[in-house]
Amino acid sequence: MNTEATHDQNEALTTGARLRNAREQLGLSQQAVAERLCLKVSTVRDIEEDKAPADLASTFLRGYIRSYARLVHIPEEELLPGLEKQAPLRAAKVAPMQSFSLGKRRKKRDGWLMTFTWLVLFVVIGLSGAWWWQDHKAQQEEITTMADQSSAELNNNQSQSVPLDTSTTTDQAMATTPTSPVDTTATNTQTPAVTAPAPAVDPQQNAVVPPSQANVDTAATPAPAATTTPDGAAPLPTDQAGVTTPAVDPNALVMNFTADCWLEVTDATGKKLFSGMQRKDGNLNLTGQAPYKLKIGAPAAVQIQYQGKPVDLSRFIRTNQVARLTLNAEQSPAQ
């Protein structure tokens, strides 16, 4: 009878009340139970008061109750009916997977950003290419225009073009000229030069030298002797004057061409010394009044010497542009 009464009394008690009675019989406090089970004191108190915290899953609550029962030596089988009532299994609320949606939105945003970046890059490359092509086309058109203008000017006025071998042709013409007229002129002009101081000479000397002998001596006198004239008389030309190379002008402009090149040269007076196309292996020797203004279509195809010194065209060659420069007396080219 006593056993059945005790069993009925235990069934009447709730799970929390049975755990509290067992704890008190063992002389344990709620703090001691919480420390042994590694729980909060509030959690132990809720279990003894048959409360189910809303923020605690039923699975964890059932586990805490079983651990509490083993601690106070209560069989788990006796607590199972009460556990179904105190901590029924509840379906866990699964939160929506926001991380996936956030990642998807971030990926979409990154895709738009990457597309915009590539678009800007393509636009910059396209603008750079268009600018380079327009600049190159403008240079080619400018060279063509200058070449057409020079051709028209050459057709209208051939005197503006300077021959390539002007100095050489002149020297050859002077060298091949017969020397007999020069000698005759020198002889005829020397006779007055020798007889000019005759009034100042002793009359006896005039009587000794007959006129015919004087003519013979004058004709036989070599050309260098004719330079010894009295004071105030101008020196007379000789046979060597026709074959002597003229002195080089210090302002001469010498150009050698390694390829076909369009060229225009203007001196300080505005006269065009040359305007036209020069062929490969050609050379040009120009003389005028400095400073010279030059326009060169292909700077890499020409070598210029001014006052015996080379002119530096490397800055035009590097940029592959039409060279516009001025050569002054100090040979300081300026664009």
Curated annotation (Swiss-Prot):
Gene3D superfamilies: lambda repressor-like DNA-binding domains. The keyword Cytoplasm does not apply. InterPro entries: Bact_Cytoskel_RodZ (IPR050400), Cro/C1-type_HTH (IPR001387), Lambda_DNA-bd_dom_sf (IPR010982), RodZ (IPR023690), RodZ-like_C (IPR025194). Residues 148-244 are annotated as: Disordered. Residues 148-164 have a biased composition (Polar residues). Residues 133-335 are periplasmic. SMART domains: HTH_XRE (SM00530). GO terms for biological process: regulation of cell shape. One of its GO terms (molecular function) is DNA binding. Keywords: Cell inner membrane, Cell membrane, Cell shape, DNA-binding, Membrane, Signal-anchor, Transmembrane, Transmembrane helix. Residues 1-111 are cytoplasmic. HAMAP family: RodZ. Belongs to the RodZ family. This is Cytoskeleton protein RodZ. It comes from Escherichia coli O1:K1 / APEC.
